[in-house]
Amino acid sequence: MTDLRHYDVIISPVITEKSTMISEYNQVAFNVAPKATKPEIKAAVEALFSVKVKAVNTIVRKGKVKRFKGIVGRQSDVKKAIVTLASGQTIDVSTGL
């Protein structure tokens, strides 16, 4: 897999109150491509951040139905990955890649 493919898998880090709380458990949250698989996410995180990944859990948040000027629309689904790192490994998501 090339580096460009890794950048296509990982879209952005998730920086919320909940995602900062899970950092205590050596976990990091990322928005990922909707068709990305767990092995692809693991390979991308290990290649881009030079860390060892212990586990990957994924969540698909369904898009909400929204109304704008009487027209009903739907937001896109978002896939989020919670990556558990091996002990002693850290990722600083506040700095860019």
Swiss-Prot record:
PANTHER family, sorted = 60S RIBOSOMAL PROTEIN L23A
Question: Has keyword Ubl conjugation?
Answer: no
Superkingdom of the source species: Bacteria
Transmembrane stretches in the record are: none
For this entry, the protein name equals Large ribosomal subunit protein uL23
**Keyword field contains Ribonucleoprotein:** yes
Write out the GO cellular component annotations: ribonucleoprotein complex; ribosome
Indicate the segments annotated as coiled coil, or none if absent: none
Q: Which GO terms describe its molecular function?
A: rRNA binding; structural constituent of ribosome
Query: Which InterPro entries does the record associate with it?
Result: Nucleotide-bd_a/b_plait_sf, Ribosomal_uL23-like, Ribosomal_uL23/eL15/eS24_sf
What's the stated role of this polypeptide? One of the early assembly proteins it binds 23S rRNA. One of the proteins that surrounds the polypeptide exit tunnel on the outside of the ribosome. Forms the main docking site for trigger factor binding to the ribosome.
Q: Which family does it belong to?
A: Belongs to the universal ribosomal protein uL23 family.
Q: Which UniProt keywords apply?
A: Ribonucleoprotein, Ribosomal protein, RNA-binding, rRNA-binding
Q: How would you summarize the oligomeric state and partners of this protein?
A: Part of the 50S ribosomal subunit. Contacts protein L29, and trigger factor when it is bound to the ribosome.
Any one Pfam family here would be Ribosomal_L23
> What GO terms describe the biological role, i.e. biological process, of this protein?
translation
